Swiss-Prot record:
Its EC number is 3.4.11.4. Its main location: cytoplasm. It comes from Clostridium botulinum (strain 657 / Type Ba4). The keyword Hydrolase applies. This is Peptidase T.
Length: 408
């Protein structure tokens, strides 16, 4: 599985950042260009039925090498990197045999990956670790997943003694902006179940996600010359501040963990005449999720009542739901991944995803899809890193899962 590092380093040098602002599919042209490159690579290693559609979805098949019928499994990763930080001119560095100390990412800018802030890195002391130069994210989310899947497929092709059923491979665009499954053709993909490789540290096995929605709050103010504004002006900036303060101050990402939900204010655009607030709403419990959506709408209603006119409009849109509901119907999909990890000396860590994956949506589209570790940490930022061994073990895990399904 040594090729996984070389592949990964090649992939992250291609800028595939997705965009929240774009209405195109995919949201950036670079994703489609990357999709075409991956399609060519899949053909080159020997996969069949390789396709890259106009929306940037890549699909391919590794044909079964056994006579009996077993479930067709899929492995999926996403091609885009987060819009949260630049993915242009990524300049990775390999820290060999990490010594357990702080890592200086950028001496000129004094950007340091500190162990007191990111203590999880100490788990990888003695290993080779890929880090950034402090100017960009790394792109392990999710190009590590892509590298691991392709490396595993090539390994299976080169080792026909390892028995497996039919395997489907899929790479999606725009996962980071919540659109990864929008145009995913489940029927064309042809798998009975699948796994995304989009998780964090080694051992992570995830079959629970948030229920997720987004909310846009539009506030219409009224601007009047401040010298004659009494009883006439409605300052949308101050109304926006009132709205923000009417939501629970402790139910935010930085003050919640585990199974706790939150309201997350993503952005504020405001001036006297108009203001716009963009939130995401998250909760694992479906009932609490529905209550949160009503709660944010109720804030708008109360402000409108206070001003005795409709100055606040709250629009809420569901994004995805907790995939546990669907995965529990085919529990063996998690059990096999658990057993595969044990078989290659990885201790499974069953954790809820405080986020979402393409698998969240796909599970409700008829393709149960839990999430496996890809190996990285600190996604979406300049402190992102991935241990090389974790990527190698993820590729090995894909092979072992395929083998276990063949032996069912």
């Amino acid at each position: 599985m040594k090729d996984v590092l070389e592949r990964f380093l090649g992939y992250i040098r291609i800028d595939t950042q997705s965009s929240e602002e774009s209405d195109t599919v995919p949201t950036t042209k670079t994703q489609l260009e990357f999709a075409k490159k991956l399609g060519e690579e899949l053909k080159a290693i020997g996969l069949k039925d390789v396709s890259v559609d106009e929306n940037g979805y890549v699909m391919a098949t590794l044909e079964s090498n056994i006579d009996k019928k077993v479930p067709t499994i899929g492995f999926i990763a996403h091609m885009d990197t987060s819009p949260d930080l630049s993915g242009t001119n990524i300049n990775p560095r390999i820290v060999e045999k990490y010594d357990g100390q702080d890592i200086v990412l950028n001496k000129e800018k004094n950007i340091v990956l500190k162990i007191n802030e990111f203590p999880e890195i100490l788990e990888y002391k003695g290993q080779d670790i890929v880090v950034t130069d402090g100017n960009t994210l790394l792109g392990a989310d999710d190009k590590a997943g892509i590298a691991e899947i392709i490396t595993a497929m090539e390994y299976l092709i080169n080792h026909p003694e390892i028995k497996h059923g039919t395997i489907k491979v899929g790479f999606t665009p725009d996962e980071e902006v919540g659109k990864g499954a929008d145009h995913f053709d489940v029927k064309k993909f042809g798998a009975d179940l699948a796994y995304t490789l989009d998780g964090g540290g080694i051992g992570e096995l995830e079959c629970e996600t948030f229920n997720a929605a987004k909310a846009k709050v539009i506030i219409e103010g009224r601007n009047v010359h401040p010298g004659s504004a009494k009883n006439k002006m409605t300052n949308a900036v101050l109304v926006a501040n009132k709205f923000i303060n009417m939501l629970p101050e402790n139910e935010v990402p930085e003050r919640t963990e585990g199974y706790e939900g939150f309201f997350h204010l993503l952005s504020v655009k405001s001036e006297v005449e108009t203001a716009e607030l963009n939130y995401i709403i998250r909760d694992f419990d479906r009932k609490k999720f529905e209550e949160r959506k009503e709660q944010i709408k109720e804030v708008g209603k109360k402000i409108n009542e206070e001003y005795n006119k409709e100055i606040v409009c709250v629009k809420v849109e569901d994004q995805y739901y907790n995939m546990k509901e669907k995965i529990d119907e085919v529990k063996y999909v998690v059990d096999i991944a658990h057993d595969a990890m044990k078989a290659i000396d990885i201790e499974p860590i069953l954790v809820p995803i405080r986020g979402g994956t393409d698998g969240s949506r796909l599970s409700f589209m008829g393709l149960p899809t839990p999430n496996l570790f890809a190996g990285g940490h600190n996604f979406h930022g300049r402190f992102e890193f991935v241990p090389v061994l974790s990527m190698e073990k993820a590729a090995e895990l894909v092979v072992k899962i395929a083998e276990l399904y063949a032996n069912r």
